[in-house]
A protein has these predicted regions:
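Asp-based, Mg2+/Mn2+-dependent phosphohydrolase catalytic module
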Residues: 3, 63, 67-84, 92-125, ...
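Short glycine- and Lys/Arg-enriched binding-loop motifs that mark or flank ligand-binding interfaces
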Residues: 7, 14, 54, 123, ...
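Active-site flanking residues adjacent to catalytic metal/cofactor-binding acidic residues
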Residues: 7-9, 50, 126-128
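A generic structural micro-environment signature
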Residues: 19, 26, 32-34, 61, ...
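Substrate-recognition element of Asp-dependent hydrolases with the DxDx(T/V) motif
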Residues: 32, 36-72, 82-92, 136
Length: 151
């Protein structure tokens, strides 16, 4: 079984400016590349989990999100860092009703556990909101492996 670093996007990988979908508005947080490199060197997969309610709200499309994601992954790759997978939830409860993927629900994490044969007890989650940490708890990530990231 493998171990992974689950990492939120807006507020952890990039400065959260609210519904970022253009690379011109995307600013990486200080130290994010070094942080990810450390975990890769320690044998972790890097998996991004991100709520993207802007899709449900019509602020941007799935295609817009995918283009920005491809660009973001490429920036990591240029630094020698592999992002194993980016999972996203395009829903918003006021528009789509409840779903199992929008954090604090653990759906994205549980899907990654299945997709990559992860040992959830060896995984770490870094998030900037309580909903991120709660998703980790609900998925079974130990409390000591939940890290609050404050930019």
């Amino acid at each position: 079984m493998k171990q992974a670093l689950f990492i939120d996007r807006d507020g952890v990988i990039n400065i959260d400016r609210g519904h970022v979908f253009l690379k011109e508005d995307f600013e990486f947080t200080e130290g994010i590349f070094e942080l990810c490199r450390k975990y890769i060197d320690d044998g972790y997969l890097i998996i991004v989990i991100t709520n993207q309610a802007g899709i449900a709200k019509g602020y941007y499309t799935e295609d817009d999100f995918e283009k920005l994601t491809d660009w973001m992954v490429e920036q990591f790759s240029k630094k020698g860092i592999t992002i194993t997978k980016v999972y996203h939830c395009p829903h918003h409860p006021d528009i789509d009703g409840p779903c199992d993927c929008r954090k604090p629900e653990p759906g994205m994490i549980l899907q990654a556990v299945k997709d990559f044969d992860l040992d959830i007890k060896e995984c770490i989650l870094i998030g900037d909101k309580e909903t991120d940490l709660e998703a980790g708890r609900r998925a079974g990530i130990p409390e000591t492996n939940l890290i609050f990231f404050n930019t």
